[in-house]
UniProtKB/Swiss-Prot annotation:
GO terms for cellular component: cytosol. The gene is argH. Pathway: Amino-acid biosynthesis; L-arginine biosynthesis; L-arginine from L-ornithine and carbamoyl phosphate: step 3/3. The keyword Cell cycle does not apply. It is found in: Cytoplasm. It holds the Pfam family ASL_C2. InterPro entries: Arg_succ_lyase_C, Argininosuccinate_lyase, Fumarase/histidase_N, Fumarate_lyase_CS, Fumarate_lyase_fam, Fumarate_lyase_N, L-Aspartase-like. Belongs to the lyase 1 family. Argininosuccinate lyase subfamily. This is Argininosuccinate lyase.
Amino acid sequence: MSEQKSSNQMWGGRFASGPDAIMEEINASIGFDRKLYAQDIQGSLAHAAMLAKTGIIAAEDHKQIENGLKTIRKEIEEGKFTFSRKLEDIHMNIEARLAELIGPAAGRLHTARSRNDQVAVDFRLWVKQELEKTAAALKNLIEAFLERAEEHAATVMPGFTHLQTAQPVTFGHHCMAYVEMFGRDLSRVRDAIERMDESPLGAAALAGTGFPIDRHMTAKALGFREPTRNSLDSVSDRDYALEFLSLAAICAGHLSRLAEEIVIWSTPQFNFVRLSDAFSTGSSIMPQKKNPDAAELVRAKTGRINGSLVALLTIMKGLPLAYSKDMQEDKEQVFDAAENLELAIAAMAGMVRDLTVNVAAMKKAAGSGYSTATDLADWLVRTLGLPFREAHHVTGRAVALAESRKVDLAKLSLEELQSINPAITAEVFGYLTVEKSVKSRQSFGGTAPQEVRRQIRYWKKRIAKA
């Protein structure tokens, strides 16, 4: 037989008996929402101050509530607070302790407030603060890439498509590609903060309240731009959580692409980079191994963060307005994604700064795979006036000849090239080096070292203001 208890919950006035033990277990969220304690106290302090200012509660009650909440915050921070599953969540745990500390005045704190708008403001505050931390972490990662890009603006490496050698680029240019990616991530963070910068506190359960509250006062006290404008939406909205998870998933995708490249580049077969000992591990059986575990774990975090996004999208997809208990399941997804994104960004910033770049190996690889074939085609267009499609065909024949000879394009003799097109002159050989190739790519956003340095200057100014 299931266990029944008399109802002593704060909401239990209309219940003749308490919840089943299993109900208590499934209903409790204190195991994870205790993470919101600071935001819950912050919101309650603002709410209590507003209640006093508007004359809804007495100044003496407000003073007791304020002192009690500050005592509770100190107890939690010092590890002296006892959390109870029977009290369900962080809100009830704090309110119960407040009643122990100050007595009946504690019961006035919840005037003109519901747990629906209470949790909405707590969670929104937490996500907003987490987004600010994410922005700072992304700035640090971007700065790490700018440092490496500046150092290697002219370091030649192969550019790839389909993971096949395509054209020479510079390592600095490759680093700047990630600056662009993480710069977009940073923009998404800033956009998300702007969109969510409204306070739901005062929406009450769903319909607002008949008390003469001042929602603008609490919004300002909590650092929001303004209060939300619809009480139904205020308590049922979790777009800010979904948007956080969405931008986290996109950012994690960028981190995963970078991690994959680091894993590949650090293999002996590529040998482009060497990870520092600080971000590597060894093997329990093979003493020679140096494994890129940090990069691999960052790559794996992407699946976890993507899963959190899909989970919350699925939770929210069919909920009628306004609040449903399903929404209690939102927090663990966001907490987990935030923790793992923060860890992944920090790990990647450390790896990027500590990477040892093998300039010689990169340059050697840059010249392989007939990477200057496009330069030959471009020369045929510019110098001989060939239509590009014809130049493409001529170059293809030159590549086939070089392959049959097992030499690079630049190692073909002038006579061999002229056997394909008699108009080719010795001038062409000056355009078939990897250095000349990257230097010639001077178009806006190109890989020429001078253009890479220009983009670095642009991003340094932009990041300083971000």
